[in-house]
Design a protein with these regions (language model features):
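C-terminal active-site/capping subdomain that shapes the small-molecule cofactor and substrate pocket
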Residues: 91-173
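Active-site-lining helix/loop region of Rossmann-like oxidoreductase modules
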Residues: 2-125
């Protein structure tokens, strides 16, 4: 979001992360592999690393739940976003989901800026930002981003429900 922030101050970010099992380490990757094999044989699975079955499933909980209903990972995303952007007043709302993908995380973002910024300007800023590649001819996927040192950004579009807002999809390892 830094290239967008350079064009117009970001007021609000709404994000849903789709985090690979590699985020839970080798044990998380092993558990996904074992559960897939067990389920394919018709066997019952018993989660150890994750709070629920991860194979063929999504779990909207990374970390532990706090009293306000958020998880520790969601609070971390909120705080890190503000810190990285050097924007103490940046409003960040996040839901973190563990998905049955071995490597590479994805994130769906909706970003609201203080001023209207054209899609062309946003796309150009993303293209010019180091370590980021704008993908316009297909949807970037975690498989494509795996073992890569860049973040792929795609599906850049205006949010039809809010002024000065854009939505985009990112994948990175």
């Amino acid at each position: 979001i830094a290239p967008i922030h350079r064009l117009s101050k970001i007021k609000h970010v709404n994000a849903t992360t789709f985090q690979a099992v590699s985020g839970a380490g080798v044990e998380g990757m092993r558990e996904l592999r074992e559960q897939i094999l067990q389920l394919d044989k018709g066997e019952e699975v018993h989660p150890n690393v994750f709070p629920a079955q991860i194979a063929y499933n999504c779990i909207a909980q990374i970390g532990t739940y706090l009293d306000d209903g958020y998880t520790t990972e969601e609070v971390k995303m909120h705080n890190e976003g503000r810190k990285i952007m050097h924007a103490k007043d940046l409003q960040v709302n996040c839901t973190c989901v563990r998905v049955p993908v071995y490597r590479s995380h994805s994130i769906s973002l909706t970003v609201e800026t203080e001023q209207e910024v054209s899609l062309d300007a946003i796309r150009q800023a993303i293209k010019n930002f180091p370590g980021v590649e704008l993908i316009e001819d297909h949807v970037p996927t975690p498989v494509e981003a795996s073992n890569q040192d860049i973040v792929y950004v795609g599906r850049v579009r205006k949010d039809i429900s809010r002024e000065n807002s854009i939505s985009l999809w990112c994948c990175g390892d």
